[in-house]
């Protein structure tokens, strides 16, 4: 198991999955038809919906303007159609329960291109993280641990300044920046499988396994506290089978539960406590 002290993570397309937001917003702004989305995105092998939409829009008249306008709307007014990538919350919980500090370091401008309403993209992102409970305190993140920068160069400087042992990003270009710190391990989030770099992972499930090869009682406690929004008094392992572990869980209120934990389900969207 790795023993990092500080982990940095990119935000857009690493923590936040914008694929559905791009589809919805492109249709809403009449840049794509529902028929085009249905016929093209279902057969897109190895290409994300975002990149397929980008390629199509850029091939049209006024493509650059339309694409940049679309980005601004997706990251601002329509960000509520995005999701948190499956497995991100688990990773944050695992870090928090082990005392590993996590920072989110993002290359994100204040405003989107051609947005006459001047919607703050940074405020929109913060609000989105709050609405998805990532800033609730249960995951070790707060507004003070999230940083935005206008350029990739300043983003890389912050990674070095914070002393990140690892940095997770979907863009290999970040790791190619001349001032990217040599002591920071590069982890590429690669959901479409288009890269073949060392330490490249298609899912957050795989990233979790890379960092954490075992589940601790403190992890189980964090799962229950986050799911029930109650303080946990004790967690004890009471038995195990080939594919699961069972725990006796007592809350501070005196309520007691039996929790069954499946190895794979600790990294997917199903409820962990049964």
Regions found by a protein language model. Name each.
Residues 6-7, 166, 257:
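Structural motif
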Residues 257-274:
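A conserved alpha-helical element in kinase catalytic cores
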Residues 215-230, 235, 266-271:
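Regulatory N- and C-terminal appendages and interdomain linkers associated
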């Amino acid at each position: 198991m790795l023993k990092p002290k500080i982990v940095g993570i990119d935000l857009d397309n690493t923590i936040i999955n914008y694929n559905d937001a791009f589809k919805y917003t492109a249709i809403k702004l009449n840049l794509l038809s529902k028929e085009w989305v249905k016929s093209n995105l279902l057969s897109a092998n190895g290409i994300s919906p975002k990149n397929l939409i980008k390629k199509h829009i850029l091939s049209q008249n006024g493509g650059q303007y339309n694409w940049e306008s679309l980005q601004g709307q997706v990251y601002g007014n329509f960000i509520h159609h995005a999701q948190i990538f499956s497995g991100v919350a688990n990773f944050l919980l695992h870090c928090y329960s082990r005392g590993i500090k996590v920072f989110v370091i993002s290359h994100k401008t204040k405003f989107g291109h051609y947005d006459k309403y001047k919607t703050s993209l940074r405020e929109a992102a913060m609000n989105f993280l709050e609405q998805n409970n990532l800033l609730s305190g249960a995951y070790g993140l707060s507004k003070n641990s999230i940083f935005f920068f206008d350029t990739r160069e300043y983003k890389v400087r912050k990674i070095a300044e914070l002393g990140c042992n690892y940095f997770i990003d979907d863009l290999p270009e970040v790791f190619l920046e001349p001032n990217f710190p040599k002591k920071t391990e590069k982890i590429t989030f690669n959901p479409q499988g288009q890269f073949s770099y060392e330490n490249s992972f298609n899912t957050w499930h795989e990233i979790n396994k890379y960092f954490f090869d075992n589940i601790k009682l403190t992890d189980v406690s964090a799962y229950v506290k986050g799911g029930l929004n109650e303080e946990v008094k004790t967690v004890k392992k009471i038995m195990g089978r080939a594919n699961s572990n069972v725990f006796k869980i007592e809350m501070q209120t005196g309520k007691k539960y039996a929790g069954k934990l499946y190895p794979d389900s600790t990294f997917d969207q199903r409820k962990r406590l049964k």
